[in-house]
Amino acid sequence: VYALFWTSSRQTFLFGRQVKFVKLKTQGEIDAMAVAGVAAAKTLHGLKDACKVGANTLALEMMARDLLASFGARPALLNYHPRFSKEPYRFATCISVNDAVIHGQPSEKTVLREGDVVGLDLVADVDGWLADTALTVIIGSGNVKAQRLLSVTQESMW
């Protein structure tokens, strides 16, 4: 029988498994994280502004790489190789269009159309500090259903 939570002199356990707690950051570390956050946010909003009818997702990918570099950041997703995958991820972004729920791969063949619902996801790395951010946009004015989806999703965050 495992105890829900207990501590020993050196270790803390939850449901019988050792857990690590988050180390409190110094002001300098917080400031460094903020630099990565600003790079990620500015890049994401640049991509949002470029999401227009006729744009292809590979062009958005290349724009993201350029923007991240201009803010002194490296794309953390590019060449990321998780243990479960045979190959590393080849892109700086995940761009999902319509029914591609998450982690869509950019492609020259994926051209944005009026009403598309597009998820933009990226991770900025500045000196080892990572900022992971995502945003969903509707291309053009979209339809009532898509607008409602984004509205309800946004409201659920707060």
What is each residue range found by the language model?
Residues A3-W158:
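Active-site neighborhoods and metal-handling regions in enzymes and metal-associated proteins
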